[in-house]
Amino acid sequence: LMRQAGRHLPEYIKIRQKYKDLMEMFLDPEVIAEISLQPVKRYGLDACILFSDILMIPYASGSDVSFKEGMGPQVKFIEKFKFESHKLDPVTKGIEKIKKVSDTPLIGFVGGPWTTLLYCLFNKEERLQMNKDLINKNKKRIDNHINELTDIVSNYAIQQVNAGIDAFQIFESAAGDLDDYLFEKWVLDPTLKIVKEIKSKSDIPIIGFPRNASTSG
């Protein structure tokens, strides 16, 4: 059984009330460690999920990312990705702090290239109403960025691996928006490249989560 920290925990709410923006919490190693371990301490779970978000890559690539109360994620559109890994040092420090105090296996994660790109190129309404016409209209833009983001995702994954995570998950939450051809091109092929890069550094288990992939096409 796995359970990520969140509003079901009073100890989480106590910390959350101190911050206006979740992003501040995602960039504080002490908070990352404490909140990641809250469900483990309360429920005795068999795995710990890193307290973080799939939008850390846009943040480290030049976008302004915020999580205001009651508004959901707000992401400033970017067309050029300048990934600065040092911006995510607080995440790796949080991982190291967790591993120092807990033997519970720690699961790190990242948003896959396709899902990450959606947040960078499209607004909330477009993401919720993603359709073939919108995808076809933006194919060239997407093609131009998928390979670039595949490398960035691989680098961030290895950053987490080097910090000490025990397993890794790749979230492609928007995989179901694609037909079979584009699913293979923008989700499956990039994921295989990311897995290959991770496996070249570590033999940790890797979990793929292509949401609604069975309904794509």
Language-model segments: what does each one mean?
Residues 1-67, 101, 193:
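N-terminal basic, low-complexity leaders that serve as flexible interaction/assembly modules and, when applicable
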Residues 1-6, 87-217:
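Active-site loop segments of alpha/beta catalytic cores
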Residues 8, 64, 72-74, 110, ...:
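Compositionally biased, intrinsically disordered low-complexity regions
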Residues 15, 34, 70, 80, ...:
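Generic signature of intrinsically disordered, low-complexity segments enriched in small/polar residues
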Residues 16-20, 68-80, 129-133:
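Active-site gating loops and adjacent loop-to-helix segments of metal-dependent hydrolytic enzymes
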Residues 23-27, 79-89, 143:
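The substrate-binding groove and active-site-proximal loops of carbohydrate-active enzymes
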Residues 47-85, 165-184:
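Glycine-rich, proline-tolerant flexible connector loops at the mouths of alpha/beta enzymes
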